[in-house]
Amino acid sequence: MAEVLSFMDVKRQKDFELEKNLLKELSLRQIIQSVKDCLEPLFPFLHDERDIITEGCIDFAIEAYLLGGRFGIFGYYGESMQSISARSAREEEELRMEFFDYLYNWIHEQYATFDKNTVYEAARKFIKDWWTAGFVQREKQCKLRMR
C-alpha cells in the first residue's frame, strides 16, 4: 500500500535537493574573496578568514545565493530579472536589513569612520551580488537540464 506524504514534507525535500544542487557550484574561496573585496574598506580589522565577522558574512552570502537560486527558474521561463527581483523584494529586503544590522553592530568608533548609509550600501551591494549569482546559476542549471 502507498505511503501518504504531506505536501510540506515533499516541498521540504524538493527545497533540500535544490539547495544541494546550487551549493555544489559554490566556492568558499569565492565567497571569502567577495567578503574581503566588499567589506574590508568598512572594517580595517578584517584580516583573518576565520574571524567571526567573516563567518557571519559567509552565512549571509549563502542565504542570498540560495534566495536568488529559488527564483532562477522564472528567468528560464522568460521573465526578466527586474520583475523577478521585485517579486523577491520582501525576502531580499529582510535579508539585507539583517545583514546591515549584523555589520552595523560590529562597527566601533575607533575602527570605522563611515555612517549608516555607507554600511547600508555595502550590505545592499553584497546581498544583491550574491542574489544575482544564485539567480544566474539556477537559470543556467535549468537551461542545461531541461533541453
UniProtKB/Swiss-Prot annotation:
Protein's gene: ybaK
Top-level lineage group: Bacteria
UniProt organism field: Bacillus subtilis (strain 168)
Pfam families: DUF2521
InterPro entries assigned to the protein according to its UniProt record, in alphabetical order: Uncharacterised_YbaK (IPR019667)
Descriptive protein name: Uncharacterized protein YbaK
